[in-house]
């Protein structure tokens, strides 16, 4: 990692972090002053563990739908290609602890879910790849370690 790269996460030393954690990965200010806050929501230890795609996919659907029940400030929830976490972005929602609360409430909702939203061929590009139980297991595991979320480097 000699030179700085354009992608923020490529500048993060993935061997130094300790999952689970939630870190502010970046902010952007729009032309009219709106601010976007992007969080790295890391469920699994990079290069050691990953989420299985059906569980990750269902958790993405559930979080994307359910988070918006807690705030209208959610812009996007996107899975990482490495399958170790998600990016969760908010607009004009600067308080880190409030973002953690939205995440915790959302994951608690996942545990109560009876079905995966938009889990059909009309609304989803890979409707056959879902696991509600897998999503619930991931949510439960992450919630159980909430006391660790702020500790990115395991210190």
Swiss-Prot record:
Signal peptide: none annotated. Pfam families: LuxS (PF02664). Binds 1 Fe cation per subunit. It catalyses: S-(5-deoxy-D-ribos-5-yl)-L-homocysteine = (S)-4,5-dihydroxypentane-2,3-dione + L-homocysteine. Its cofactor is Fe cation. Involved in the synthesis of autoinducer 2 (AI-2) which is secreted by bacteria and is used to communicate both the cell density and the metabolic potential of the environment. The regulation of gene expression in response to changes in cell density is called quorum sensing. Catalyzes the transformation of S-ribosylhomocysteine (RHC) to homocysteine (HC) and 4,5-dihydroxy-2,3-pentadione (DPD). Belongs to the LuxS family. Homodimer. This is S-ribosylhomocysteine lyase. It comes from Listeria monocytogenes serotype 4a (strain HCC23). The lineage of its organism: Bacteria, Bacillati, Bacillota, Bacilli, Bacillales.
